[in-house]
Amino acid sequence: SYSVIRDEAPTAFVIGNVGINQVTNYHEEGTLDKNVERLTAMVRADALAVHLNYLEEVIQPEGQTRARGAFDALEAFVRVSPVPVIAKETGAGLSAQVARRLRDIGVSVLDVGGRGGTSFAAIEAERSRVRGDVRRSELGASLATWGIPTAVSVRACADTLPTIAVGGIRSGVDAAKALALGAVAAGVGRPLLVCASEGEDAVLRWLNGFEVQLRSAMFLSGAHRVKDLAQATRVVLGATSEWLRQLGID
């Protein structure tokens, strides 16, 4: 049972997770209330995340690519949820326009899930290659770099809703940069998964190193608190600068 999460970490902030296609199905079936209650109770969640993984769905042989009614379903989900709702991308990032629509239907927080971290398009391409599905393998390979980079997505969304930076965060310095761009938090995946394969001590060592890196970046930036990084002077260069310029984002 997923309840072990709360049993092992009684004071942790626990986020339940469900896909937008499931939410849309629940809404159409008239079972939204029941399923929201079940999802919340399953892990005694402090918040519920709805992942918007359309890029992955396009490539999966079992993927659901119908998006009609998704915003209406998500709005209804937000209305009945007893806890805040996070809208979460899974590798393709969120645009400013989508961020505003999500805000308007009552979403509380954005998890940008930008390009630069795990590529589910590439993963699905490899799955298809192993199965001998050449068409989907080629589709996944062609879309492997699709999406908005994490840094750009953070900057695009941060003025609309509290924004979590996820996608390619590999160090405490990366987290500091994301916070300076306007994120309120940063999420890490792959580095911890690699350490977890080595054991608990490796995870703790990595987390301690991450903390030292973040604190060092704060000290060197004159930031007394994490939120002070948002006031740090930013210099944005290269492709990220060009993305922001073309999108008209400061």
Segments predicted by a language model, with ranges:
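Glycine-rich phosphate/ribose-binding loops and adjacent secondary-structure elements
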Residues: 68-198
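Active-site entrance/lid segments in N-terminal catalytic domains of soluble metabolic enzymes
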Residues: 1-101, 105, 119, 124, ...
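C-terminal extensions of enzymes
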Residues: 192-250
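Alpha-helical scaffold segments in soluble metabolic enzymes
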Residues: 4, 38, 76, 101, ...
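Generic structural signal for well-ordered, non-membrane alpha-helical segments
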Residues: 32, 67-70, 146, 150, ...
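Electropositive, surface-exposed helix/loop patches at the edges of structured domains
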Residues: 12-40, 146-166, 170, 221-239
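Generic secondary-structure signature for well-ordered alpha-helical cores
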Residues: 10, 41-44, 79-82, 104, ...
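Short, structured secondary-structure boundary patches
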Residues: 2-14, 70, 108-111, 130-136, ...
